Amino acid sequence: MSCQQNQQQCQPPPKCPPKCPPKCPPKCRPQCPAPCPPPVSSCCGPSSGGCCGSSSGGCCSSGGGGCCLSHHRPRLFHRHRHQSPDCCECEPSGGSGCCHSSGDCC
């Protein structure tokens, strides 16, 4: 009997529960930052062939080194071209691949 009582006394004390974390002071809700303005770009989207205006150098963003022709309405019977007729691709072997002031390829 006394031995069992001694064993109970020798047992480690039960672990204390962790301390409660300090309560955070109430904070004001952070205000949402102002939405970013839409990117200013003179390039059209992929739906229009990715052709850029002369203000951005006349390069075609989707054609890779292409140039913009004069902005006219694409004709419907130009079905054999994959991109908009407003955009022409400069061949890599065709010199510097620059664009004329009119937007045509050099």
Swiss-Prot record:
The keyword Cytoplasm does not apply. Skin-specific. Expression was readily detected in adult trunk skin, adult arm skin, fetal skin, penal skin, vulva, esophagus and tongue. Not expressed in the cervix, rectum, lung, colon, or placenta. Residues 11-25 have a biased composition (Pro residues). Keywords: Keratinization. GO terms for biological process: keratinization. The keyword Chloroplast does not apply. Pfam families: LCE. Residues 1-10 have a biased composition (Low complexity). Induction: By calcium and UVB. It comes from the Eukaryota. Residues 1-25 are annotated as: Disordered. InterPro entries: LCE (IPR028205). Belongs to the LCE family. Precursors of the cornified envelope of the stratum corneum. Belongs to the LCE cluster present on 1q21. Interacts with CYSRT1. This is Late cornified envelope protein 2A. The lineage of its organism: Eukaryota, Metazoa, Chordata, Craniata, Vertebrata. The gene is LCE2A.
